[in-house]
From Swiss-Prot:
The chain crosses the membrane at residues 19-39, 48-68, 85-105, 129-149, 156-176, 178-198, 224-244, 252-272, 283-303, 309-329, 344-364, 366-386. PANTHER family: MAJOR FACILITATOR SUPERFAMILY MFS_1 (PTHR23517:SF13), RESISTANCE PROTEIN MDTM, PUTATIVE-RELATED-RELATED (PTHR23517). The keyword Hydrolase does not apply. The gene is yhhS. It comes from the Bacteria. It is a multi-pass membrane protein. The lineage of its organism: Bacteria, Pseudomonadati, Pseudomonadota, Gammaproteobacteria, Enterobacterales. One of its GO terms (molecular function) is transmembrane transporter activity. Pfam families: MFS_1. It is found in: Cell inner membrane. This is Uncharacterized MFS-type transporter YhhS. HAMAP family: MFS_YhhS.
Length: 405
């Protein structure tokens, strides 16, 4: 974790601008993810003639690479400093675009084309984990650890914004110039971000002796578990709300997803100081309560307006969960390990979103679509109970943390 430079207290617009000037590099990395997201499955399946399995695998490779590389990103950020990690990650995003370009050149050889696409996706996953983790830590190093919750919140906002912009923009690029046009756009975004990052001043890496990974995991895993349980609510909304509306015979699933996104981003913008004022665990418990009500409304909805209100409340509730628990998780370790702590904590959400889809799909096949929202509400209730326990008995007092220290 970088050592923040001592400076006068920041607040308001100046603080937000300082944070945005750093998290824009995470925006760039997620834009390179969003650009090919709506294009590559169709390209692999329709243009190259591969099965739906291979089309899905090409997309999933990036998520697996992100999941596996994220702990390394945190550790290297602690040792080398976050700016170097961000630049490294953005270079990975650039190379992913190069992989797409080479795949287009090799389109006459389908297997080589597929291998190059897969390689580009793996490199993109690694690049995103480094750019995302590094930009958060760089932002904290610039504005100070007091504002870590706000830095994490802004990172989430730019992530959603980049993904929302990237998908339609990628479709336009593909319609304009094919896979080559898409690849050049990805490379251009990443290269511009690298050129903007290089002149910016870096923050010093902390020189303290780092804890071993097992000790870091012992300090943050309970916070990560609460995050994983709460992420199930987001997972079932994002993945299955369209099927839910179809099963009910309703229109408006796309609008429901828009409501979720507006509630998610709006809550982060409306309550930027909530975590500092109330404390991370208190905010998390309030958020869990709102998310539970929202999921129960969706699961029991008899009319479309009930489902829409439920989706809105779920978005509001889930919005501050990640930064609220993340602030406490990161502060549970020494400064020289806070990069590793943030990365390890984030892995729990990655894993949760990875398994929520298949497991919820099995439950849906067995018991129907509405049941998955009731089940998700139960998981969020477990997160609420776990967080209440953490408030009463922090991990530093728990045997598993003590034995790892």
């Amino acid at each position: 974790m970088p050592e923040p430079v001592a400076e006068p207290a920041l607040n308001g617009l100046r603080l937000n601008l300082r944070i945005v000037s750093i998290v824009m590099f995470n925006f760039a990395s997620y834009l390179t993810i969003g650009l090919p997201l709506a294009v590559l499955p169709g390209y692999v399946h329709d243009a190259m003639g591969f099965s739906a399995f291979w089309a899905g695998l090409i997309i999933s490779l990036q998520y697996f690479a992100t999941l596996l590389s994220r702990p390394h990103a945190g550790r290297y950020a602690d040792v080398l400093g976050p700016k170097k990690i961000v630049v490294f990650g953005l270079c990975g995003c650039f190379l992913s675009g190069l992989g797409y370009l080479l795949a287009d050149i090799a389109s006459a050889w389908p297997m080589i084309n597929l291998l190059l696409l897969g390689l580009g996706r793996v490199i993109l996953g690694i690049g995103q984990s480094f750019a995302g983790t590094g930009s958060t830590l760089w932002g904290v190093g610039v504005v100070g650890s007091l504002h870590i919750g706000r830095v994490i919140s802004w990172n989430g906002i730019v992530t959603y914004g980049a993904m929302a912009m990237g998908a339609p923009l990628g479709v336009l690029c593909y319609a304009w110039g094919g896979l080559q046009g898409l690849a050049l756009t990805v490379m251009g975004v990443a290269l511009l971000a690298v050129l903007l990052a290089l002149p910016r001043p870096s923050v010093k890496a902390n020189k303290g002796k780092p804890l071993p990974f097992r000790a870091v995991l012992g300090r943050v895993w309970l916070y990560g578990m609460a995050l994983a349980l709460a992420s199930a609510g987001f997972g079932v909304i994002a993945t299955f709300i369209t099927l839910f509306y179809d099963a009910k015979g309703w229109d408006g699933a796309a609008f429901a997803l828009t409501l979720f996104s507006v509630a998610f981003v709006g809550t982060r913008l409306l309550f930027p100081n909530g975590i500092n004022r109330l404390g991370g665990l208190n905010v998390a418990m309030i958020c869990f309560g709102v998310e539970i009500i929202g999921l129960l409304l969706v699961g029991t909805a008899a009319m479309p307006w009930m489902a829409k209100i439920g989706v809105l409340l779920t978005g509001m509730g889930f919005s501050l969960v990640f930064p609220a628990l993340g602030v406490v998780a990161v502060k549970a370790v020494p400064p020289q390990n806070q990069g590793a702590a943030l990365a390890t904590y984030t892995v729990f959400m990655d894993m949760s979103l990875g398994v929520t889809g298949p497991l919820a799909g099995l439950v849906m096949t067995w018991a129907g679509v509405p049941v998955i929202y009731l089940a998700a509400a139960g998981l969020v209730a477990m997160a609420l109970l776990l967080t209440w326990r953490l408030k009463k008995r922090p991990p530093s007092a728990l045997p598993e943390a003590a034995s790892s220290s």
